[in-house]
């Protein structure tokens, strides 16, 4: 999308957030914005009503109709460490194709968020054979989950929430339940 390239985003770890008129949000990595020549913002004119659509994205989830906003956002990085053969820094821009969306309850409102299955992060980290738990922390709270609670399902996810104040990681379930807000670290035990 030449329009986004023209804005000259400074951070290579940024994401392009696409917002549709129905509230749907999806991310496209800036790598894809720069490298995918098939990615376009198309204009559709039906009966004098114009709408914009994103087409050509690598993920079919990013083919968004009724685009009302394109925003380049800086991403946060979350360290996933501990008893792991492959500790890594979770960067949402590298996991876009693994994300699914659902409405998550944040206080008195529901917000549609993208999230990666905790199981996928666990597998990618290659836990040591005797590892059974993951400790997930925020500045004020700690949750310990046994891998049996998430290894057979993609229900528990690490969601990415964006607002005027920046990016926040939220641990939650696909049914919208929030387990922990403002996640700051994950440690495999």
What are these regions (language model features)?
Residues 1-189:
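N-terminal intrinsically disordered, low-complexity segments enriched in P/E/S/T
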């Amino acid at each position: 999308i030449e329009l986004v390239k023209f804005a000259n985003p400074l951070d290579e770890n940024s994401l392009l957030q696409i917002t549709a008129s129905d509230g749907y949000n999806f991310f496209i990595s800036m790598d894809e914005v720069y490298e995918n020549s098939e990615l376009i913002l198309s204009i559709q004119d039906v009966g004098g009503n114009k709408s914009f659509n994103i087409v050509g994205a690598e993920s079919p989830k990013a083919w968004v109709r009724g685009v009302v906003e394109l925003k380049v956002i800086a991403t946060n990085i979350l360290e996933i460490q501990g008893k792991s053969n492959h500790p890594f820094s979770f960067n949402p821009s590298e996991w876009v194709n693994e994300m699914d969306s659902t409405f998550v309850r944040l206080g008195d409102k529901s917000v549609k968020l993208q999230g990666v299955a905790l199981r996928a992060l666990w597998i990618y980290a290659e836990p040591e054979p005797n590892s059974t738990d993951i400790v997930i922390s925020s500045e004020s709270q700690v949750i310990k989950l046994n891998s049996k609670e998430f290894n057979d399902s993609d229900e528990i996810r690490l969601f990415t929430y964006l607002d005027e104040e920046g990016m926040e990681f939220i641990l939650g379930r696909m049914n919208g339940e929030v387990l922990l807000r403002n996640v700051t670290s994950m440690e495999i035990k």
